[in-house]
Regions:
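Acidic/histidine-rich catalytic neighborhood of metal-dependent amide-processing enzymes
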Residues: 126-202
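Acidic/His- and Gly-rich active-site-bordering loop/insert found
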Residues: 8-123, 142-149
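Short, Lys/Arg-enriched N-terminal segments with co-localized hydrophobic residues
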Residues: 1-8
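Flexible loop/turn segments at secondary-structure boundaries
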Residues: 39, 98-99, 162-165, 192-194, ...
C-alpha cells in the first residue's frame, strides 16, 4: 500500500483525539498492574500484565501470541497485511517494571496513576509501559481508520528487561523468521525535549566480565 497522505494522517489524528480519554483509562489499567519481574511474589502480576497487553494488541488489530520462556513470557504481535515485498518494522518494548522502593519517596502510590502538571506519575509510566502502549495505540488508529499500513509491523514485548533480559537472546535466536525486519524501533529510550523529535541510533548497552585472579600462597614483601 502507498504511504499515507496528509489527509489520511488528519483522519488518524482525529481518531486519536476523539479516543484520548479511553486511551488514558486503558493506560491507567496497565500501570496499576505491579509487574515487578525481579520479585517472585509478583510472578502472577507479571503474567497478568502480559495477558492484558496481548488482549489490547489483539484489539488494535494484531495477531498475537504469548510465547513462554524459562522466565516471564514474550508477547508477540504481528500485522503482515502490507505483503512480502513491503518492509517490516519491529517495535520493541517491555511490560515489566522496576521495584518501587523506597516507597517513602513517592508523592503518590506507585501503582495508582496520578496526573500532576500534565504528567502521569506511576511506576512504568515512562519505563516502559507508557511508550510501548503509545505505539500500540498508534497502530490501532492506523488500522481502524484505514484498515492497512504501508509496512508490516511486529511488536515484541518482553517481561524481563528490568532483570537484564536473560531469555531474550535465546528467544530471538529461536524465532529469527518471525522477527526478521528492516528496522527496529525501540520504545525504551530517552527524549531530549517534548518539542524536539529525535532518533537515538545507539545505546551504551551492557558488558559482563568474570575475572579470575591468582597470586602467591602467602604475603610477600613488595620488593620481592
Amino acid at each position: 500500500s502507498l504511504p499515507l497522505s496528509v489527509a489520511d494522517m488528519s483522519e488518524v489524528l482525529t481518531f486519536i483525539e476523539s479516543n484520548l480519554d479511553r486511551f488514558r483509562a486503558e493506560l491507567y489499567e496497565f500501570l496499576r498492574i505491579p509487574s515487578i519481574s525481579a520479585k517472585t511474589e509478583h510472578v502472577e502480576d507479571t503474567r497478568r500484565s502480559a495477558q492484558w497487553l496481548a488482549d489490547r494488541m489483539q484489539d488494535a488489530g494484531l495477531e498475537v501470541e504469548i510465547i513462554e520462556t524459562p522466565g516471564h513470557p514474550v508477547v508477540l504481535g504481528e500485522w503482515r497485511g502490507a505483503g512480502d515485498a513491503a518492509p517490516t518494522v519491529l517495535v520493541y518494548g517491555h511490560y515489566d517494571v522496576q521495584p518501587p522502593e523506597p516507597l517513602e519517596e513517592w508523592v503518590s502510590p506507585p501503582f495508582e496513576p496520578t496526573e500532576r502538571d500534565g504528567r502521569i506519575y506511576a511506576r512504568g509510566s515512562a519505563d516502559d509501559k507508557g511508550q510501548l502502549y503509545m505505539h500500540i495505540k498508534a497502530l490501532e488508529a492506523l488500522l481502524t481508520t484505514h484498515g492497512s499500513m504501508p509496512v508490516n509491523v511486529v511488536v515484541l514485548a518482553e517481561g524481563e528487561e528490568e532483570t537484564g533480559s536473560p531469555n531474550l537472546v535465546p528467544f530471538v535466536e529461536a524465532n529469527l523468521d518471525k522477527l526478521a525486519c528492516d528496522v527496529v524501533l525501540i520504545s525504551d529510550t530517552s527524549m531530549f525535549s517534548e518539542k524536539l523529535p529525535s532518533l537515538g541510533f545507539s545505546l551504551r548497552g551492557l558488558a559482563y566480565f568474570e575475572i579470575h585472579v591468582s597470586g602467591a600462597r602467602s604475603d610477600l614483601h613488595s620488593g620481592e
